[in-house]
């Protein structure tokens, strides 16, 4: 089967929490605020002071007071005139915003503070901050204080030395009369000037100011003595403007007319004749965002729409849950030799394979010593062989390992009996005896000479993660996320084009001309007049801001199935299936003639190594055999250290495999062996389960509503994605039928001897084996016909070998002992004769292999039924229309009544919403 790179590195997606602001009630309800940072190093641009296009920052928008009113957290009230709206801030509300979201680089050196407000009740006698910036410890850095006890206003600021400086404006009784007032402070480099109701009160010198700490909060309406307590007052307008001279140009037309006792009024005369049309008025300002409408009823299912354009590739989805096992794919041709893998852990022993039988071939290169296999079943008693001559004394055997004893940490209570010790070193080779008759399989004999190459060792466990693979195929577009919370206002943008003129007001009836009266005493300021006739088309207005995204509509009913799409590209290979159950072994047939090479069979699991047979005499060297069919992929060899990549040599003719050699002692854990050959890809697996819902994305820009489309043509295949996370390792399946014998691969580079395991590692391995096989060993100890073996003693010095005795009866199978320490790799044995070609096995059931790569993106699904959501907010203002043809000038009329226009609200603010002195009702 085809091998895939495995990767075990997970990519974590950190979702960033957006900035937060709060307006907390006594139950601590929070209101988010909008950031006004322009992203630069300073809050205000360095351009000529005195222009109305300098940016300003509406604190009512920043503190989300309008949204709080729509939630009925605070109350909307009538403002200074019937055309104005104000907000009544009670003592149960706490408006505060992190300073870093408003002024990340601090306040500018020069600016102005403007507000229209009214105090009532007990607030007239309190000492409180209408606006204040605190540091992280709650200490004041900048603020405007109103003192009802001393009838004064104070501007506080942080000096260069960090101390709090104050400029106090005294004797202001007219401010504390429960009426609407407009308070403005122009902060310049060396002075602070107070304006009340557009009248300049006083200018006081101030010292150089220090930089504020942006880690604190900006608050509204707090007591000076207890900054945690809010003060009730009514707020219509509050603005921070980059022009310190803005208060000098402000008007107070929105304030009610004040009639004093020192003024007299005359009767108002009749209206004059209609005056001529006035000059074009200034461009109107965008209106405030409307309140979200209620969700509409669920609409009926819509008809299937036309095919839509192919969607853009979606972001990679989260790793899905492991899919079901797929069917075993067809066997592929052998791949090129891959790079040497990392060191693997010992794998689960495989079942024993069927012995092969082939034409004897030339001796192969010496093979590495295999890992010790389990004890095989005792065979029937063989015929007695001829007695050979006594051999010479063998050399002393190595000392055995110290056995466990009761009380040892590995077996604190009682140690299980150990297995028989490993055989000693081979003795000197005796004289060649007469050839005996072929006997039945006998019990295990003395350890013979170094055998031929043994069977492949156990499959190692998964190694460490390999290098990062290629980028994965783009995942399917995820479901639409829920509506996110409204973010902060964006940064101030460039100055937009002027807006279109407002709607024409109703023309008033012309009045009759009255008799000219005597000149009277100058009257008080008149009330605003009716709007004049429509002027010429003004310049285009500023584009309005995007509205808040509407609530998602209810899920519609499923639409009708669309027409079948085009045939897609071939899918990626699926997950290998689970191996099938072991078939019933057939009767042994007669040896047939060598057959033609068959088709490549599926790879079977490595079998358990059987007990070594008696070493027979070496036969004459046979002729080279014909090239056999490619066999199944072998198990990983003894790992060696990663060697340098050598130049590939010319492939030699593969020789037949040698006879299995005697199992050697278990060697130490070696370095990783070379990577096996790459197999063919498997069949496409079943679709995996749907992944978890992704994190909520940021709200996207408002788009136009399009017609639902039918599935489009399949797009090109995306970039290959990262390999998925490897699923949990399944249990070993039953042994499959033996595959055809494959050609022996080129011998790998001989690695250096492995490092000896540490004592701690040996104890861990022994403890794990004891825990896994303790039940089995305990059951074996209870057999009535077998006595429990004692603890292994220290081996004594070997005596001279005696003459071989008669073959005795086979003994019972011993208790499976603890695995020994892995011995050093043995020398490669001679290549044995090639076995007979076995019959091709039936196709096994689905195997279970590593998780395959994600499948290609499927075709777009059928469009869902149309549904009616909530009424959305008004769309953005369209582009200005083409100016019309100028009309014929009319005859001049008499002067009309005074018009009403609020210069502050008619001013264009770059990148900001309209800074009117209060939203219209």
UniProtKB/Swiss-Prot annotation:
Query: According to the UniProt record, where is the region Nonhelical region (NC4)?
Result: 24-268
Highest taxon in the source lineage: Eukaryota
Annotated region (Nonhelical region (NC2)), positions in chain: 757-786
Post-translational modification (record)? Covalently linked to the telopeptides of type II collagen by lysine-derived cross-links. Prolines at the third position of the tripeptide repeating unit (G-X-Y) are hydroxylated in some or all of the chains.
> What residue stretches are annotated with the Laminin G-like domain?
50-244
Annotated signal sequence is 1-23
SMART domains in alphabetical order: TSPN
Q: Where is this region: Triple-helical region (COL1)?
A: 787-901
Q: Which Gene3D superfamilies does UniProt cross-reference here? A: 2.60.120.200
The segments labelled Nonhelical region (NC3) in the record are 406-417
Compartments, as annotated in UniProt? Secreted, Extracellular space, Extracellular matrix
Q: Where is the composition biased (Low complexity)?
A: 368-383, 594-632, 639-650
Segments for region (Triple-helical region (COL2)):
418-756
A Pfam family annotated for this UniProt entry: Collagen
Q: Where is this region: Triple-helical region (COL3)?
A: 269-405
Query: Which residue intervals are annotated with compositional bias (Basic and acidic residues) in the record?
Result: 479-489, 833-845
Q: Where is the composition biased (Pro residues)?
A: 273-285, 298-310, 387-398, 794-804, 888-900
Q: Which GO terms describe its cellular component?
A: collagen trimer; extracellular region
Q: Is Chloroplast a UniProt keyword of this protein?
A: no
Subunit-structure text: Heterotrimer of an alpha 1(IX), an alpha 2(IX) and an alpha 3(IX) chain.
Q: Which family does it belong to?
A: Belongs to the fibril-associated collagens with interrupted helices (FACIT) family.
What does this chain do? Structural component of hyaline cartilage and vitreous of the eye.
| PANTHER family assigned to the protein according to its UniProt record, in alphabetical order | COLLAGEN ALPHA, COLLAGEN ALPHA-2(IX) CHAIN-LIKE ISOFORM X1
What's the record's remark on domains?
Each subunit is composed of three triple-helical domains interspersed with non-collagenous domains. The globular domain at the N-terminus of type IX collagen molecules represents the NC4 domain which may participate in electrostatic interactions with polyanionic glycosaminoglycans in cartilage.
**Name of the protein in its database record:** Collagen alpha-1(IX) chain
Species for this entry: Mus musculus
């Amino acid at each position: 089967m085809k091998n895939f790179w495995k990767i075990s590195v997970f990519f974590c997606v950190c979702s960033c929490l957006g900035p937060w602001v709060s307006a907390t009630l006594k139950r601590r309800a929070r209101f988010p605020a909008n950031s006004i940072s322009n992203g630069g190093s300073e809050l205000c641009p360095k351009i000529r002071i005195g222009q109305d296009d300098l940016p300003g920052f509406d604190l009512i928008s920043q503190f989300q007071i309008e949204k709080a009113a729509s939630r009925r957290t605070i109350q909307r009230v009538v403002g200074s005139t019937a055309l104005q709206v104000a907000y009544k801030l009670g003592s149960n509300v706490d408006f505060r915003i992190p300073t870093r979201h408003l002024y990340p680089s601090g306040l500018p050196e020069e600016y102005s503070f403007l507000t229209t407000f009214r105090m009532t009740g007990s607030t007239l006698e309190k000492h409180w901050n209408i606006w204040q910036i605190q540091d992280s410890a709650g200490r004041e850095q900048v603020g405007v204080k109103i003192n009802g006890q001393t009838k004064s206003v104070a501007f506080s600021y942080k000096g260069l030395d960090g101390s709090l400086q104050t400029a106090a404006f005294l004797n202001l009784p007219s401010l504390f009369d429960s009426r609407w007032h407009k308070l403005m402070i122009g902060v310049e480099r060396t002075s602070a000037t107070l304006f009340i109701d557009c009248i300049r009160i006083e200018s006081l010198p101030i010292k150089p100011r220090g930089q504020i700490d942006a880690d604190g909060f900006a608050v509204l309406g707090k007591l000076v003595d207890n900054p945690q307590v809010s003060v009730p007052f009514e707020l219509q307008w509050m603005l921070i403007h980059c022009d310190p001279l803005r208060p000098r140009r402000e008007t107070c037309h929105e304030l009610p007319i004040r009639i004093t006792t020192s003024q007299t009024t005359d009767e108002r005369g009749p209206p004059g004749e209609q005056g001529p049309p006035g000059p074009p008025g200034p461009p109107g300002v965008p209106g405030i965002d409307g309140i979200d409408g209620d969700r509409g009823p669920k609409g009926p299912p819509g008809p299937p729409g036309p095919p839509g354009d192919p969607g853009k590739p979606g972001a990679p989805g989260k790793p899905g849950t492991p899919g079901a096992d797929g069917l075993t794919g067809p066997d592929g041709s052998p791949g090129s030799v891959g790079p040497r893998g990392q060191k693997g852990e010992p794998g689960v022993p495989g079942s024993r394979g069927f012995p092969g039988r082939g034409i004897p071939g030339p001796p192969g290169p010496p093979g590495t010593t295999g890992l010790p296999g389990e004890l095989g079943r005792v065979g029937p008693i063989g015929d007695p062989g001829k007695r050979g001559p006594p051999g010479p004394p063998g050399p002393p055997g190595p000392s055995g390992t110290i056995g466990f004893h009761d009380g040892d940490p590995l077996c604190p209570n009682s140690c299980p009996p150990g297995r028989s010790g490993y055989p000693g070193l081979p003795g000197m080779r005796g004289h060649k005896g007469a050839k005996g008759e072929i006997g039945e399989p006998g019990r295990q004999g003395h350890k013979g000479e170094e055998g031929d190459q043994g069977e492949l060792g156990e499959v190692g466990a998964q190694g460490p993660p390999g290098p990062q693979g290629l980028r994965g195929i783009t995942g399917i577009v995820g479901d639409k996320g829920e509506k996110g919370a409204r973010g902060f206002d964006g940064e101030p943008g460039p100055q937009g084009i002027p807006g279109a003129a407002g709607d024409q007001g109703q023309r008033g009836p012309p009045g009759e001309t009255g008799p000219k009266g005597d000149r009277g005493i100058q009257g008080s300021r008149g009330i605003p007049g009716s709007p004049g006739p429509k002027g010429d088309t003004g310049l285009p207005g500023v584009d309005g801001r995007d509205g808040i995204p509407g609530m998602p509509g209810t899920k519609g009913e499923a639409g009708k199935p669309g027409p079948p799409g085009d045939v897609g590209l071939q899918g990626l290979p699926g997950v290998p299936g689970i191996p099938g159950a072991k078939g019933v072994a057939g009767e042994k047939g007669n040896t047939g003639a060598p057959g033609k090479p068959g088709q490549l069979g599926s790879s079977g699991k490595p079998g358990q190594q059987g007990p070594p047979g008696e070493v027979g005499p070496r036969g004459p060297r046979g002729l080279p055999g014909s090239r056999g069919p490619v066999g199944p992929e072998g198990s990983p060899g003894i790992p060696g250290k990663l060697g340098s990549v050598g130049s590939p040599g010319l492939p030699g003719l593969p020789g037949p495999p040698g006879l299995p050699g005697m199992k050697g002692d278990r060697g130490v854990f070696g370095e990783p062996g070379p990577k096996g050959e790459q197999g063919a890809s498997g069949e496409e697996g079943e679709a995996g389960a749907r992944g978890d819902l992704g994190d909520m994305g940021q709200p996207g820009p408002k788009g136009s509503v399009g017609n639902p489309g039918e599935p489009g043509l399949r797009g090109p295949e995306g970039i290959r994605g990262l390999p998925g996370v490897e699923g949990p390792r399944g249990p070993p399946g039953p042994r499959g039928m033996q595959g055809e014998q494959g050609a022996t691969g080129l011998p790998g580079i001989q690695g250096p001897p492995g490092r000896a395991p540490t004592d701690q590692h040996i104890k861990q391995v022994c403890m794990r084996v004891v825990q896994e096989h303790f039940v089995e060993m305990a059951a074996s100890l209870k057999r009535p016909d077998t006595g429990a073996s004692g603890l292994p003693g220290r081996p004594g010095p070997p005596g001279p070998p005696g003459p071989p005795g008669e073959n005795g009866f086979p003994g019972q199978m011993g208790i499976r002992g603890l695995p020994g320490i892995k011995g050093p790799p043995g020398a490669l044995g001679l290549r044995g004769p090639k076995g007979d070609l076995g019959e091709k096995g039936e196709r096994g059931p689905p195997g279970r292999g590593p998780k395959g790569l994600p499948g290609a993106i499927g075709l777009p699904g059928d469009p869902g039924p149309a549904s009616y959501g909530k009424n959305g907010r008004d769309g953005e203002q369209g582009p200005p229309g083409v100016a019309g043809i100028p009309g014929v000038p009319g005859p001049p009329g008499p002067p009309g009544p005074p018009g009403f226009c609020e210069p502050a609200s008619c001013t264009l603010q770059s990148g900001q919403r309209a800074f009117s002195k209060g939203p219209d009702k």
